[in-house]
Amino acid sequence: GTLVFYTIDGRKTGHSIGASLTQVGERLLELGCQTVLCLDGGGSTNLAVTTPDSTTATIINRPSETGRKVTNQVFLVASDRSSGRLDHFYVNAAGDYVLAGSAVSVTASGVDSNYIPMDASYTLSASAGSIAEQEDGRYLLTTPASGSDITVTASGRGAKGSTVVHAIRNPDNLTLKNGASNLTELTVTPGSKTALTAGAVWNHLPLTATNEAFTWSVSGDIG
């Protein structure tokens, strides 16, 4: 069976609108859950995990309230001793959802049978697009402009591991920014230079995007 810990952040402007118990229940049914237990309904809920490529726990959600001095905790623990036996590879992309044609960084780490990270050589392959090793040892996946669900696989010493990167061809909308502010118009001094960045959103999710995925143009004699 599978155990799911499901956390939804509370109402927080620009980040989350929260969810009712009915909405959470419907979502858990969509995930195939059969038995459900509500552990907390407060804005201070924290979900911390130790990913397979680390030995330190990190909070992965964004609580809508501050922490509490007295709390209840549920821990899932495992042995902290390395077995030294390679079990699989943990593959992680800097973005799971990217704008088609963009490049995204991918890393991989060996994981032993006790889920402790270990050094192990590997090769990376992708089911679509292209992948290349960078000078810093990381890999860069360039997604196809046509869009695709891309499986990136690390393999070595008889072990494997994979992750899926979703390259979205048709985003719901594009944004143009000057710094942190979204732009609909811009007034500048003649002869000046303004740094602009573009972004893409799909299904309310910001897509990881690089400049190569955008085509820039201006209208009128403005530069």
Please tell me what each predicted stretch does.
Residues 1-215, 219, 223:
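Gly/Ser/Thr/Pro-rich low-complexity, intrinsically disordered segments
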